[in-house]
């Protein structure tokens, strides 16, 4: 049973090779309708049939011989089911038709310029013209207004004479041909004997050895561009070419300067780098310079071996300090001159071949090279070798001979110039009309008209050519390119120098900043050391006035402030003097009390009256608010003064009070804690408000069980260790050992100004403490029984509601607290002043 279905795809087909239905009528009708919709007026020429492929497919279970079927192993076998392209109506296939098209004479195609390739020395491709050929075909002469006016008049005459008119392009071509032939023939005439060419000059010499003679195998060769004359061996020419020959500089198209002399041009060879050039004669006559290959006479080497003394010589002939000069070979003669300058002035320059095949070069200054004879020179040399003084009788005819020689040279030069000027005046004789007419295929009459006009126009222009010769144009172009490259080289050189200067400046600035940083670090270390020493002296005892003054001066006035808002040094010194005066006054009051035995002065009332005057005066003078963070520091200073007073009275200090470092007090009394039988654990310190903690401490200090104990009572010292409080009992009189405070430099930014309520509470607490303890004795060195000690401890614990304060005061500590209350305002204000001045001074 056949069933119609759409053409199968890769997803519809199964791997088991299921049967495919033929192309049904339904699909055929659909395809035809779609074809008709696409092609309304014409029938389709081809269709895709799938029934042909479907009819060829068989099921796998179909029984056939192996030679009657093919197995489709292609993974893309689904593409077979797309159908076969079958033509339907062969009549609609177009038939080829040919027709003859008439040839159009107009130019149909113009080759764009971008397809014109300049291949250089390579031959152009087929169908293309070399760009140089196109450039040569362009006329180099352009008509001006005068030429156009003359051409108009000439065409009118040609009409009257019945001759064809002359166009502008033909006139330009003829004038260009005249100029080219005139230039070529004139140069040829100058190079020949009739025109005084250099090849036929009898006085010409080699540019290297200055010899006019040539030999077989060592001929004299002339450059066809710069006309220098050199021997083959002198310039390193291995084989003379048959045609023209160019020297190295002309072959490369450069005009360099000699590295050893100021002369331009001549027989030059490059150095090993190829960027610098040296005359061969300069390389031969300067002793330090050598030549790499004697056969090729190049490259010039060992230029760097020339000493600085030779570079510093000034030429006596040209008076220029440029390059390297040589000196006269006569003994005791130091006259210096360039090699090329000596050749130009005709000085005596000898080349002597020694017995050991060594070549010696002898050069003489103008004084010693005036027509010397060989016998005289040999005799003088022998006399100089024998030590005889040099005596050279001067010829009276020498000046006249030199004048005659100069006159002959000037006459020869003038004759040459006259002949060259005559050749330039007779420029028209170097052009042949018949040759020009044949070359351009023009009538002789037309060429003759143009020839007469060309002569007149060139005469008006002072016999100068109307167009620049092509060779000179190329040379000028090469020179311009060389100048551009030289300017770019100078620009890059200056840029390199500027960058080097910037690098040096950057290095120096970096070095300066490093030095400044190291100096600042050293000053900071010195400042910290001075601060530490000052604090240690003030904590340990009474510092000497000299050491205290010197430390303060070094600490506060080490370096003057340079800021616009910084205080003046005079003001800081005045504050420092006032600070020392106040500290000395309070310290004298505290030290004089124990030395006096008067009971009236030792009474609590008198002490309170005497000491209460100072803080009031200081407080009114300063008028500053005392922050809470200074209380611990002031307590430490008050205790230090108390310790110093006890030392004056002979009171024995405990051993554990002498500390050399800033370790916590718990580390120092750890050994004592092990020996104590009474141990009690306390709660850790809670992070409560600072004001609450201060109130608790004040309440503990002013309690009756602690503050009003009899003299001789013994109290427990509770040191602070790692956030917990520990009470330690001592068998002897306990004195509070002040801990070394931290350096104020580290806590400069940690000051907190207390609020208004806290200030009032602190003021009230301090006033109450001061009035309550005003009747206490100064020292309590007796002992308290154990019962009273237990009572006071129990009462203190009950009043604190289970909270243990940071420090519980002993009798000596209570007295220190009195002094702290008395000196609080004055000492804290002075402490604030010194820290503020330290900040400003730094």
Curated annotation (Swiss-Prot):
Zinc fingers classed as C2HC pre-PHD-type: ranges: 255-289
Phosphothreonine found at: 92
Residues recorded with modification Phosphoserine: 89, 603, 703, 743
GO cellular component: centrosome; ciliary basal body; cytoplasm; cytosol; histone acetyltransferase complex; nuclear speck; nucleoplasm; nucleus
Chain intervals annotated as zinc finger (PHD-type): 203-253, 313-369
Skewed-composition ranges (Basic and acidic residues): 787-798
Region (Interaction with histones): 80-188
Residues in cross-link Glycyl lysine isopeptide (Lys-Gly) (interchain with G-Cter in SUMO2): 114, 573
Record remark: domains: The 2 PHD-type zinc fingers are required for transcriptional activity.
Protein name as catalogued: Protein Jade-1
Organism: Homo sapiens (Human)
Gene field: JADE1
